[in-house]
Amino acid sequence: MVVAVGRPSNEELRNLSLSGHVGFDSLPDQLVNKSTSQGFCFNILCVGETGIGKSTLMDTLFNTKFESDPATHNEPGVRLKARSYELQESNVRLKLTIVDTVGFGDQINKDDSYKPIVEYIDAQFEAYLQEELKIKRSLFNYHDTRIHACLYFIAPTGHSLKSLDLVTMKKLDSKVNIIPIIAKADTIAKNELHKFKSKIMSELVSNGVQIYQFPTDEETVAEINATMSVHLPFAVVGSTEEVKIGNKMAKARQYPWGVVQVENENHCDFVKLREMLIRVNMEDLREQTHTRHYELYRRCKLEEMGFKDTDPDSKPFSLQETYKAKRNEFLGELQKKEEEMRQMFVMRVKEKEAELKEAEKELHEKFDLLKRTHQEEKKKVEDKKKELEEEVNNFQKKKAAAQLLQSQAQQSGAQQTKKDKDKKK
């Protein structure tokens, strides 16, 4: 007997008080301990022109020196280079992957510059989807390479966004969390920088580019995120060099006219970027990647494969029903293909039989022709043989007659000689 158990509604749930300590209040601690032991992964995609300061900013953000090869402006196309690192802060381990867009914006024809980036992001989604679809999944040990944040480096022109930037961000906004930043912000005057920021945000809105929205629905981060959102795009300066300022050493850039401190919020937005990207919203970026961007890719892929939540009448459609429907569809296609192949095979066999019969007929005709030719040649040879035999017989007869005449002549000559000798005596 099968008993159907329905999902209880909220009205059926009752709040009960506990008479003693049970222990499930330790669930948050269990989750923290499990996450700490497993470690975390975070993947950053840096999109920007060559020499705009992507590597320097990454070094500054994470207070370390990552491996980086100096890039030239002679790349034939855009290629993506990913490097992974193991970082540890206190007892928290982070597997960080930094993906650089080498050669971006260096080509004369920039129409397809975004394609390698889109293909790379989709490839990481596809790899994760294939791991999910395995019968024996191993997501616990799987190295998740999906991009969690895209830092889009905008050149400090002070005017407006380049068409390449708008096209690329529009192609990426449904696939990744875009955080626009103005690179090398120390090259723009402060009053121009404010206008430049407003211009960029206006162009993004007018062109329908969806950038990452800092979450404001959680009380713990709502206030700081709401405050920081007005500073987008962040104007940043990166530097790993320390300069003495007063009695302290600070990361800064030294110029003849003065010093630009990286962590001074009056000089640039580096601290705001670090707060938003790492200290406040890193987990939300990871969650948004999985629940929004990856789910969109997964849904599209499953729909391409024929899996849907509802049937044509908008009725719920279970996975088992989808499987049966697709199985029947594939079986029908298979039978159709088999019948087509059978018909094709029969047709090919008939064509081959006709070819073989025609070839056999030609061979018989050639054989008959050769046979007649052989018989004619044989007859000619036999006739020649008879002629030769007759000639040989005639020759033998003539030879015998000649020998007889010669013998008779010799005998008569001998007799004549004997008579002559007798006369002399």
UniProtKB/Swiss-Prot annotation:
Q: Where is this region: G3 motif?
A: 100-103
Q: Which GO terms describe its cellular component?
A: axon; dendritic spine; septin complex
Give me the stretches of Low complexity compositional bias: 401-416
Q: Where is this region: G4 motif?
A: 183-186
The residue ranges of the Septin-type G domain are 38-304
Gene3D superfamilies membership: P-loop containing nucleotide triphosphate hydrolases
Compartments, record wording:
Cytoplasm, Cytoskeleton; Synapse; Cell projection, Dendritic spine; Cell projection, Axon
Q: What superkingdom heads the lineage?
A: Eukaryota
Residues holding GTP? 48-55, 103, 184-192, 238, 253
Q: Name one GO molecular function term.
A: GTP binding
Q: Name one GO biological process term.
A: cell division
The entry's keywords: Cell cycle, Cell division, Cell projection, Coiled coil, Cytoplasm, Cytoskeleton, GTP-binding, Nucleotide-binding, Phosphoprotein, Synapse
Where in this protein does the record put region G1 motif? Answer: 48-55
Quaternary structure, from the entry: Septins polymerize into heterooligomeric protein complexes that form filaments, and can associate with cellular membranes, actin filaments and microtubules. Forms homooligomers. GTPase activity is required for filament formation. Interacts with SEPTIN7, SEPTIN9 and SEPTIN12.
Family, as annotated: Belongs to the TRAFAC class TrmE-Era-EngA-EngB-Septin-like GTPase superfamily. Septin GTPase family.
Protein name stated in the entry: Septin-11
Q: Native species of this protein? A: Pongo abelii
